[in-house]
């Protein structure tokens, strides 16, 4: 009865039940009442929720998006602050980088303030607002999205990750402008793409984690270790991320816990910590607790029940046979997918957390500033501040003597001074978050807003010589002033008629460039229609070739130009009209079949003199230098390259024309066949025309097997000829034959052409045309062809006698008056002058170009053809003329616009001549200058200010200008070099986790785990610790560091993962050592062995008086740890299969099938869960049962437990029941 009564007493929770409270409620029900009742309650809650949601009729309309009225004033104050920043920049008090950072931080703070206003406004005016309830109950949406709906969208990042300093001040309720919309679209697209890519990354991370930890199974109850790890609050920059109470739940104590004041025992060793006990420990004021942990567990290749603690799903001690490795891998991998998705929802909105801001908790005065602990620094906003060089503290004392102590870590920037009054919630300091922010070195170009003269102020410059150029770098920060004026570029060849201090008017010529010809001739002006470029040609020579004309005709189905002479010789043009030609250029080729053969053959020269090397622009043929003859022995050559089995004829066969040689290949001529084959492949079939004579005695031919037989000569005593023939000896089926082959003789006469005579009769000095006969074949060359070739070509070739690069020769087609289709052939030589070449350095508005000569005019050498004049645009004075070498030639004019005159009205001035004035400074007691500049003149009546613009450059900036140099608007003054944080939502999260777990050796990150491990190991060895202890302790240090680093990434995204999951993974990464010297253990240097295994080996070596192996701890990334696992089956199924299996085979490895993966691959029952107890004896089970009785659970009523045991029968209950039966 009592148990029923205790159950009927309700538990009262007086809170708003949002998503988190709902979680806690269900966990409480699950822990106290079991899975069935908790599920039932969750069902009822769901029905309750739907019922009231239906009755209330929650809907979402545009009216629910309420914009807080304070938004307008907040925006106005922010814009005012931005104006002040811009003014500071214009005064040269901050650099462009500091301005950008200040603008971004100002907008970011405005956006955050507005977010708070939105929350307050909803809370106070409309707590039942649909949007507010939805976001804050945790049902849908988050505060960041609500901020964009009713606050402001804020700052966005561009595709490169750079923040755009133009914020979107409107929200979705007010609507976006076109600019806002375009800026927004960057982030939205980025979110979609990133999500797709990162989901795959996250999946691969999970796979690697599973692989590295799949063999971690709970195999024993207690490993009897005395070691553990100390748990405390996880703090990051003064913010508690995971409190001790949260961290303790589900752990087992490694030592007794006593009350620090009373001394009473709170909990004993090996007791598991329930949430209630954790609360009690924290209430007692205990800050650090030693607990058992998977990283200190002594079990070989597994974890014991006590070191693991609770199975967090059930809220009680983990079962034997539980595959905790896989649970750990999934627990770490799964949130990765959520992290990948998170970018998508905020859509690239920038959230700036470059520094953690420390606020004043009370109104008061800041005291206790120890100046020895600080150094003066410039903040990223360009303000002076103090930075702590060591951890220190400041005190804020209110008027009521209330004191608040604030601890500052090293590197914190203090923004207020000693004894300065601060108000509550004022930002007093910033601590950097640099340790986990990726810093990159960036550059920012400072561009001039004015044209004018450069003046350096307080700038120390250091010059460094690099191979080709000198780099100027600022050693100290300072100002670059640009004194306003008009700057004109002057071409190098220009003549400058003005002098320094001359007065000029609009239209005055400042510089003049003249275009002069080298040769006399006739002027021809070409105006390019597509641009304003004008070319002027001076024609030094022009000649028309007589007795020939050009017309178009169709040759080989292609329209071509044909040159015909009055002797009916026809030439095919190889050039086109107005084409520029060089010496040896082939203009045309004679159309003739005189030297065309019908097939291939052998070529022999007779009394023919040809050039030794190939000539012409293409170097493709030999010039024939004298008359002579070409002897041609024809033969038809088919290139086959087919198998010899496909042949339809045999070597030595005599065939008729049209015979099929191989399939679809026919002979064109009759003759005897010669087959050339290699390795069973027929390369060529040669058909040799001629007559065959059978020989009775071969040896009478002496030593020759081929040659020419002239008329009147005899061969073999009885073979004679009446014309020149070619003979060769052939042997067919051991019978000798003589093949007599016909020879065609081609005569090549001396070149005489009316065309040449006509040309030479003209007195041409520079360009001629000559006829040249050319051949592409060498003496004795065998020409492989079926259709025939041109043995000799007759070409019309240009002969140019001048070698001046300024003179160009060209072919011209001159229209004939009597015919529209015919042209005369002209040759001209001319000099080209381009007007573009003289005005490309000068802007069009400042210059005018005049062509002084007219088309068709005949001019003498060194005549001015055109001139470009650079003219003044304004009235003023010539202040500077720079014509030094190695710099641009420039002229500086000062006009009335560049000076500003102040009427003093007899007032005393507060400035002197030469003073630099910044905008907002006083000239006299009542006159404020709105411009920056330099005072150039002061009289009783007036003061003159030369307008200028100051640019602040930081130290280590790269200067692009010299002092007193002239610069134009938009040119680079300097490049500022600075460090900036890489922006990123979770995009930095996943790669960061991967980097930690893969133990990457990054150089630019402060945390290099490999270096830390080495350093701590060396330190412990120096302190005299044994090798094993030094390795174990250095491992433990790095383990805790890695766990903390992973937690920081996940916590920054609001994802809670229990430490023990990360510890299981880290344990696998830090289980191996690298052998340095194997001594007598049989291990090789560089081999990776488990720490416990090598220590056991060393102990056995010591007992046998043998030398121990030396080693050092090594940190493996998860991929490497997977590949170096004991099981080669598991490693091979992960990556590098061939390599793993080869190494395993060579070293004769055994796989004991301890893990899950190798058993799955083999096809056995996995050694976890129900498959775990297969080999255990009953006695062991009995012992475990007794031990389990001693383990305390949480403080829920025993009656509740007993009453609910039969509601759900899970594996464990069934197994325990079965085991108890067998023991009894």
Swiss-Prot record:
Q: Which UniProt keywords apply?
A: Chloroplast, DNA-directed RNA polymerase, Metal-binding, Nucleotidyltransferase, Plastid, Transcription, Transferase, Zinc
The answer on whether this UniProt entry bears the keyword Zinc-finger reads no
Q: Which cofactor does it need?
A: Zn(2+)
Where does the UniProt annotation locate this protein?
Answer: Plastid, Chloroplast
Gene Ontology molecular function terms on file: DNA binding; DNA-directed RNA polymerase activity; zinc ion binding
Q: Where does the chain bind Zn(2+)?
A: 223, 297, 304, 307
Q: So what EC number does this one have?
A: 2.7.7.6
Record's protein name: DNA-directed RNA polymerase subunit beta''
